[in-house]
Amino acid sequence: MFEGRKLLISGGTGSFGNAVLKRFLDTDIAEIRIFSRDEKKQDDMRKRYANSKLKFYIGDVRDYQSVLNATRGVDYIFHAAALKQVPSCEFHPMEAVKTNVMGTENVLEAAIQNGVKRVVCLSTDKAVYPINAMGISKAMMEKVMVAKSRNVDELKTVICGTRYGNVMASRGSVIPLFVDQIREGKPLSITDPNMTRFMMTLSDAVDLVLYAFEHGNNGDLFVQKAPAATVETLARTLTAMMGKPEHPIQVIGTRHGEKLYEALLSREEMACAEDMGEYYRIPPDLRDLNYSKFVEQGEEKISRMEDYNSHNTERLDEAGMKRLLLKLSFMQAIQRGEHATPEE
């Protein structure tokens, strides 16, 4: 489906962008464009891959003109650019709005103007019942995506999205932090032992985006069914795997804007979601404001549903957590006694 096509990845120097490159650079894709702000990361990536299919565009999703220029001649877009650190977005909420909301508006408008065939927007479980600025901005991003998809010709451009949880060992995530603390002999800093999070590998994240790309219609949102684990289970598993089962753990309390558990689908979304095996598809609500022509009687299904969250999904024990961790190249390197860097 990518033969001879051009793909642009916004925020492409991050963990997701690197995972996509590893998957696609050796295929028959014509070109992959990396669009991001950081020229140093782009230069590092250029040297690392040294591939003529890889093109680099310096720019910011906040700047419509730079997005418009970069997307000219592109067939597909994976929109991954985002501010995603919860505490920093709490202190700078308008920066989250500028990147996650207005930046998405710019990417989608540029895609429509340039006749891009398909766009997949990457969202997060924090957009469901959001209590923090990052989650609120991502929830608004999803609303922008659905609103844009209502008014676009599906024969020209398809806009859909994905929503996923914690991507294990990605840059800025907790697993590399715990590994560093174990190596340095520092107590593991746990916010709340009972806090649960969905667990996904980077490969899972790429698979989810490709599934949405292949199956999505305008306004669709896709979610992968994923296991979850408590932060304590993750910490205990890591200390055991690194030969330090008695390593101390320090409970430091939740950070700004953190939740005890995350949800991937709200109760309302579960009522209309389509079960597609390993994934859920959430279709857009395409009603207009004249509700009387759509609904004559109240919908009882919603009151019977339960949201899909990290407390009620499959719960990993330490053995299950270990099996999942060993899928990561980051942890495989550690097990071999080699230097490991976060998943890229």
Residue ranges and their predicted role:
Residues 28-41:
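Conserved glycine-rich Rossmann-like NAD(P)H-binding loop of the short-chain dehydrogenase/reductase
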Residues 36, 58, 98, 192, ...:
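Conserved residues in the N-terminal Rossmann fold of short-chain dehydrogenase/reductase
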Residues 10, 71-80, 121:
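Rossmann-fold scaffold of SDR-type NAD(P)-dependent oxidoreductases
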Residues 6-27:
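N-terminal Rossmann NAD(P)H-binding glycine-rich loop of SDR-like oxidoreductase domains
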Residues 56, 96, 159-162:
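Hydrophobic/aromatic anchor residues within beta-strands of the central parallel beta-sheet
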Residues 55-76:
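Conserved Rossmann-fold cofactor-binding substructure of NAD(P)-dependent oxidoreductases
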Residues 107, 113, 143, 147-344:
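Strand-loop microenvironment adjacent to phosphate/nucleotide-handling motifs in alpha/beta enzyme folds
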Residues 79, 83-139, 143, 147:
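Conserved Rossmann-fold NAD(P)-dependent oxidoreductase catalytic core, especially the SDR/UDP-sugar
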